Curated annotation (Swiss-Prot):
Pathway: Amino-acid biosynthesis; L-histidine biosynthesis; L-histidine from 5-phospho-alpha-D-ribose 1-diphosphate: step 5/9
Known role: IGPS catalyzes the conversion of PRFAR and glutamine to IGP, AICAR and glutamate. The HisH subunit catalyzes the hydrolysis of glutamine to glutamate and ammonia as part of the synthesis of IGP and AICAR. The resulting ammonia molecule is channeled to the active site of HisF.
Molecular function, one GO term: imidazoleglycerol-phosphate synthase activity
Originating organism: Xanthomonas oryzae pv. oryzae (strain KACC10331 / KXO85)
UniProt KW Amino-acid biosynthesis keyword: yes
Keywords annotated in UniProt: Amino-acid biosynthesis, Cytoplasm, Glutamine amidotransferase, Histidine biosynthesis, Hydrolase, Lyase
Protein name: Imidazole glycerol phosphate synthase subunit HisH
Amino acid sequence: MTDVALIDAGGANLGSVRYALERLGVEARVVRDAAGLQGAQRVILPGVGAAPEVMSRLRAQGLVAPLRELQVPLIGICLGMQLLFEHSEEGDVECLGLLPGIVRHMTPALGIRVPHMGWNRLVPMRESALLAGLPERASAYFVHGYAAPVTADTVAACDHGGLFTAIVQNGLRCGAQFHPERSADTGARILHNFLEMSFP
């Protein structure tokens, strides 16, 4: 069985992510320090809340450098995905810098509410095993007020007043802006793909 490390960065969605993994037959280990990453074959960084507070917690746990040096597949979920980028406008905070790009505040407009909350369609941008088995026009559940730009690493985007990155992958580093644990079959499939796919 795959050894999965689930990082406890203080997010309220930790339990629901763990339960989503259990439904896939995976018993994840909850990790709160660098030692807990040893032996992991997959690492999951969930997150809700504010980027400065979660980055501060990761620093206090001694996890920033180990995450930057990680040599096994990593997926960030929601805020966890945003933290994979270089910087966030939320609190003007330096993030992990594993992916190029700056996370910016979403701009409200007529008919466009911020935070972005609810179901929205995924727009595939390039091929990736993360999308294997997803139906056309698959939708996922989003709750966020900041978003990462579309880059060459974007696997799928979403449109809410403009396109932003919904799924990202660069080598071993992956991310989902939406909540897979709240996205029914779509979320379960993406978690399954992350756990089972081959990485370069």
